[in-house]
Amino acid sequence: MPSRVEDYEVLHSIGTGSYGRCQKIRRKSDGKILVWKELDYGSMTEVEKQMLVSEVNLLRELKHPNIVSYYDRIIDRTNTTLYIVMEYCEGGDLASVISKGTKDRQYLEEEFVLRVMTQLTLALKECHRRSDGGHTVLHRDLKPANVFLDSKHNVKLGDFGLARILNHDTSFAKTFVGTPYYMSPEQMSCLSYNEKSDIWSLGCLLYELCALMPPFTAFNQKELAGKIREGRFRRIPYRYSDGLNDLITRMLNLKDYHRPSVEEILESPLIADLVAEEQRRNLERRGRRSGEPSKLPDSSPVLSELKLKERQLQDREQALRAREDILEQKERELCIRERLAEDKLARAESLMKNYSLLKEHRLLCLAGGPELDLPSSAMKKKVHFHGESKENTARSENSESYLAKSKCRDLKKRLHAAQLRAQALADIEKNYQLKSRQILGMR
């Protein structure tokens, strides 16, 4: 039996969608809180009616945890009003989240931005998939106001009023629709719209989540179109990682064939862990719905990915243990080197002490004046004649004078040599002091 308007209780109005009013309602049968979109199709043109039918059919076909769930539709032919009953997202939309961040002057956490990116990309993957008859769904109006959050801040993509189904034999849609701030360069140039146009809009949305403003702004649509075709925009705030900035920059590439696909985005290392977690949760939900335990088959690509992650973690643990062993070995080597340095320092101090004693001893010996070797000429045998004579007296005086002069010269030479040795010892002492400081520096 089809549902009636009387089966629901209107609680209050939430806002206005693309072509109608949204109201929060309660289903009387079980008290479940839902929302319906109230649309007056009597005032619509044939094109608008066609778009309305398209949205209803899409909502019935698209079933994904990150897409707003469709529950029912009610046709009031008397008042030419269509009610589309959908899931209620009590977390509001991303537009209100951005407005709050702008008002509070507080940026959103990168973890939240990455989670939004992951869940939105998974929703777009469901839309862009070429299965179930080869249909591809383009959202064509991806913006913060059309992305909703549930009570746990999970993303829900909604408002498919502008979406259009593409078949295999029709690769592009050419209708000029969408929100100007998020329109792609090909839309601004009146070119064909494809899956990569949704990727551009996703990049604009993620950019606005980070910067709290769109990447391209202008006072009129002509100026905005020029800026979008030029493709220049500022980097997202530096509080966000380079990886996130690079991925958003790739999404906002002027050439659509250079933009990443949904599969390439999901394969990014930046969100690989989040993707695996979302896929695991989705499988658990399916298991609960079917009443079977949520076991993954061995052939499941998700299980293979989880096993790969586990192996990678084990490899990282082994690498960390190996690094710990290396660090312990280095610590032992440092202890040995420290002991060797202490031994070298003790030997150096002992050598310095011995050299100091030797220096003092040698200086004392030089000051005492050891016996001097006389020259060979002074050692000639003297001729003695008995009795005193003038010759003998003169020779004796000359010998004494010669000996005194020779001794003086020899003493000067020895004093000079002692000074040279003292200087050499001082240099040696300085050298050992320097070596001692170097040894201490090794510690």
Curated annotation (Swiss-Prot):
It is an enzyme of class 2 (transferase). GO terms for molecular function: ATP binding; metal ion binding; protein kinase activity; protein phosphatase binding; protein serine kinase activity; protein serine/threonine kinase activity. Residues 8-271 form the Protein kinase domain. The modification Phosphoserine is found at S171, S184, S241, S300, S356, S389, S396, S401, S436. It catalyses: L-seryl-[protein] + ATP = O-phospho-L-seryl-[protein] + ADP + H(+); L-threonyl-[protein] + ATP = O-phospho-L-threonyl-[protein] + ADP + H(+). ATP binds at I14, G15, T16, G17, S18, Y19, G20, R21, C22, K37. GO terms for cellular component: centrosome; ciliary basal body; condensed nuclear chromosome; cytoplasm; intercellular bridge; kinetochore; microtubule; midbody. Its cofactor is Mg(2+). InterPro entries: Kinase-like_dom_sf, NEK_Ser/Thr_kinase_NIMA, Prot_kinase_dom, Ser/Thr_kinase_AS. Residues 282-303, 383-402 are annotated as: Disordered. Residues 282-292, 385-398 have a biased composition (Basic and acidic residues). Activated by autophosphorylation. Protein phosphatase 1 represses autophosphorylation and activation of isoform 1 by dephosphorylation. Phosphorylation by STK3/MST2 is necessary for its localization to the centrosome. It is found in: Nucleus; Nucleus, Nucleolus; Cytoplasm; Cytoplasm, Cytoskeleton, Microtubule organizing center, Centrosome. The modification Phosphothreonine is found at T170, T175, T179. Residues 301-443 are annotated as: Interaction with CEP85. Residues 264-443 are annotated as: Interaction with PCNT. Belongs to the protein kinase superfamily. NEK Ser/Thr protein kinase family. NIMA subfamily. Protein kinase which is involved in the control of centrosome separation and bipolar spindle formation in mitotic cells and chromatin condensation in meiotic cells. Regulates centrosome separation (essential for the formation of bipolar spindles and high-fidelity chromosome separation) by phosphorylating centrosomal proteins such as CROCC, CEP250 and NINL, resulting in their displacement from the centrosomes. Regulates kinetochore microtubule attachment stability in mitosis via phosphorylation of NDC80. This is Serine/threonine-protein kinase Nek2.
